[in-house]
């Protein structure tokens, strides 16, 4: 699996996930829409969202745009 892993809106950097990591995720804070920064990467399970945080998970190559 290959996931994007940079904070910019238009991300071009990616990483190859390790064994056991079968999910790509994207997290961002819903309060900061103008200066939106993302956390992206690979995970074994979908990370849990904190208050006011949006988490999106998927399981195909570079799906965490």
Swiss-Prot record:
Query: What SUPFAM superfamilies is this protein classified in?
Result: Snake toxin-like
Q: Which cysteine-cysteine pairs are annotated as disulfide bonds in the entry?
A: 3-24, 6-11, 17-42, 46-57, 58-63
Instruction: Give me the Gene Ontology terms describing cellular component.
Output: extracellular region
Q: Where found in the cell?
A: Secreted
Q: Which PROSITE patterns match?
A: SNAKE_TOXIN (PS00272)
Classification via InterPro entries = Snake_3FTx (IPR003571), Snake_toxin-like_sf (IPR045860), Snake_toxin_con_site (IPR018354), Toxin_cobra-type (IPR054131)
- Top-level taxon of the source organism: Eukaryota
Keywords assigned by UniProt, alphabetized: Disulfide bond, Secreted, Toxin
Pfam families per record: Toxin_cobra-type
Q: Cite a single GO MF annotation.
A: toxin activity
Tell me which tissues or organs this protein is expressed in. Expressed by the venom gland.
Role, per record:
Binds with low affinity to muscular (alpha-1-beta-1-delta-epsilon/CHRNA1-CHRNB1-CHRND-CHRNE) and very low affinity to neuronal (alpha-7/CHRNA7) nicotinic acetylcholine receptor (nAChR).
- Report the sequence similarity comment from the record: Belongs to the three-finger toxin family. Ancestral subfamily. Orphan group II sub-subfamily.
Q: What is this protein called?
A: Weak neurotoxin 7
């Amino acid at each position: 699996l290959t996931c994007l892993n940079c904070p910019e809106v238009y991300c071009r950097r990616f990483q190859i996930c390790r064994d056991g990591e079968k999910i790509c995720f994207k997290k961002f804070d819903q309060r900061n829409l103008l200066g939106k920064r993302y956390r992206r990467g690979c995970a074994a399970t979908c990370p849990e969202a904190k208050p006011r945080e949006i988490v999106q998970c998927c399981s195909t190559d570079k799906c965490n745009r």
